[in-house]
């Protein structure tokens, strides 16, 4: 869930905005104050690895996943990484299948070694507390990305003193959207979990909206014709 809210899909921007929607792109361009956002949808995970296999994509940075396990075709993933010109693996374990293909390994902290938030399938946002320190040079994924951005000359866009500031920026991107959580502070999440939406105009003393889209008016699908699956009547039950 949480990855979709922050725009972690190839066709999305923050807070359920769509890359192909010019209004959505303009909103994020103005919010970030940076360059023009391309209207081209990015590659999905399977498309990226297919691109590596075919030589259309040269490099890949793998974060928070093991494609040898998560992708449907593990053999294709292996061939793709063998064919890649440059592979960066950001991992919590030195035993991951992807390590042997890496040109650069970035040691990442595990869930118990970092803090942040997660969103589950009922739209419930929960604060995750750090339990122990990460070993050696391992860092939280967000900190690795911020440090990389600074090396690339974008440090002024990634100047966060703590993870609460990152969360605060995210909440501002949700303002006025169907997942508005401007009424949910980082401190509040440390006290209890909250279900979105929970906008600042409608504080969530009892934990946010239990039922989303309950007005039966907004964000609903149009009625569609019901039809049997292809092949019905030939062995379908």
Spans of features found by a protein language model:
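Long, low-complexity segments enriched in small/aliphatic residues
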Residues: 4-9, 165-237
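Non-catalytic alpha/beta scaffold blocks inside enzyme catalytic domains
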Residues: 1-180
């Amino acid at each position: 869930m949480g990855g979709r809210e922050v725009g972690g899909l190839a066709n999305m921007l923050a807070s359920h905005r769509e890359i192909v929607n010019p209004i959505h792109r303009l909103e994020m361009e103005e919010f970030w104050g940076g360059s023009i956002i391309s209207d081209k949808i990015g590659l999905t995970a399977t498309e990226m690895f297919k691109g590596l296999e075919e030589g259309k994509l040269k490099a890949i940075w793998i974060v928070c996943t093991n494609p040898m396990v998560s992708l449907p075709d593990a053999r294709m993933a292996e061939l793709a990484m063998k064919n890649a010109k440059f592979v960066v693996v950001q991992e919590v374990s030195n035993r991951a299948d992807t390590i042997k293909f890496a040109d650069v390994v970035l040691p990442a902290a595990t869930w118990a070694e970092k803090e942040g938030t997660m969103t589950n399938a009922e739209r419930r946002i929960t604060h995750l507390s750090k339990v122990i320190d990460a070993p050696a040079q391992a860092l939280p994924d967000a900190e690795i990305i911020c440090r990389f951005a600074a090396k690339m000359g974008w440090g002024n866009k990634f100047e966060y003193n703590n993870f609460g500031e990152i969360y605060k920026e995210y909440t501002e991107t949700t303002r006025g959207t169907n997942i508005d959580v401007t009424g949910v502070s980082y401190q509040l999440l440390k006290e209890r979990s909250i279900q979105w939406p929970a906008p600042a105009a409608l504080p969530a003393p009892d934990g946010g909206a239990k039922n989303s889209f309950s007005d039966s008016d907004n964000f609903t699908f149009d009625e569609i014709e019901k039809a049997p699956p292809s092949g019905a009547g030939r062995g379908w039950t």
